[in-house]
Amino acid sequence: MKKENKSVIIWLLSGCVLLFLMVVVGGITRLTNSGLSMTDWHLVTDTFPPLTDAKWQAAFDEYKKFPEYQKINIHNDFQLSDYKFIYFWEWFHRFIGRIIGLVFFVPFVYFLAKKKLDTSTIKKCIVLLAMGAFQGFLGWFMVRSGLIDNPDVSHFRLSLHLTFAFITFAYTLWVALDLIYPERNINKILPLRNIARYALAALLIQIIYGGFVAGLNAGLIHNHWPLMSDGEFIHESVFIEQSSLIKNLIEGKSGVQFVHRTFAYAVVAVILFLFFKSKKYTLTRTQSNGINTLVVFVFIQFLLGVFTLLYSVPLALGLIHQIMAFFLLSAMTYTLHRLSK
């Protein structure tokens, strides 16, 4: 690491921490059914929550016009105090998004003015800023889907929002790693790099399906392992909830859960393959540490997934499972970087 890059690295890693925090709060927002509490979006006027009783009541009255209240919460003795709870989590999620925007943009302008960024890093940072702006759009695009008729957001949009947050985090970490390890890696092992790429692709597919499971509440059924309900590996409901096999596998609760729980074995398998294949090569310390950490994390994540399913997605386990996915992606990004650069 070059000394002149230290402040830029700290900036990028701070962004990673904030992105991690935002996904954690996003997970709490989803698991507490708070995501539809703010029914519009304003860049400036939503910066702070309502500060008077009258403004709180006005926000609550506006919320009552939308499907989540009219079809669900109206039957649950839902009071203003309940509304304040769900409002807080959605507001906090958006507030962190605004902080992230400032943390990325203001120092970027400063580093540009001080000429602390080379041309390559400038281009990467511009991509990061664009990704952040697009992520904000995806968040509102997701929320809008739950404000029309169905009081649930589209699981496709939720998964897109979630997965793109993971990708933005991974790319931010990658840019930071480029500065932490500016020297070219003379121990670049192409076979391992290619396997790591497949592992990353498998992990991203699993994250996408994790979003599907979350959006459809598919973790609340077939709460058994290693088999589904009735002691079946593939329960009959996997094939009958939707009109076609493809629809069952991307829209049916049972089908989506089946893919997510089964594909977990594939993720574990490809990472184990990377681990055992790496034993045939002489690795650097960072390469070895990355692969070893990856193996530990994938087994922890697998077990968390099993227990989250068995206990029907309690808030704590569901959140820890999502957090562990972040750590797993971090280890995957680090490992691939050390095998590639």
Swiss-Prot record:
Subcellular location: Cell membrane
Protein's pathway: Porphyrin-containing compound metabolism; heme A biosynthesis; heme A from heme O: step 1/1
GO biological process: heme A biosynthetic process
Keywords: Cell membrane, Heme biosynthesis, Iron, Membrane, Metal-binding, Oxidoreductase, Transmembrane, Transmembrane helix
InterPro entries hit by this protein: COX15/CtaA_fam, HemeA_Synthase_type2
Spans traversing the lipid bilayer: 8-28, 92-112, 126-146, 160-180, 201-221, 256-276, 294-314, 315-335
Catalyzed reactions per annotation: Fe(II)-heme o + 2 A + H2O = Fe(II)-heme a + 2 AH2
GO MF terms held by the record: metal ion binding; oxidoreductase activity, acting on NAD(P)H, heme protein as acceptor
Entry superkingdom: Bacteria
Cofactor(s) in the UniProt record: heme b
HAMAP family: HemeA_synth_type2 (MF_01665)
Family of the protein in this entry: Belongs to the COX15/CtaA family. Type 2 subfamily.
PANTHER family: CYTOCHROME C OXIDASE ASSEMBLY PROTEIN COX15 (PTHR23289), CYTOCHROME C OXIDASE ASSEMBLY PROTEIN COX15 HOMOLOG (PTHR23289:SF2)
Quaternary structure note: Interacts with CtaB.
Name recorded for this polypeptide: Heme A synthase
Organism of provenance: Flavobacterium johnsoniae (strain ATCC 17061 / DSM 2064 / JCM 8514 / BCRC 14874 / CCUG 350202 / NBRC 14942 / NCIMB 11054 / UW101)
Gene name, Swiss-Prot/TrEMBL: ctaA
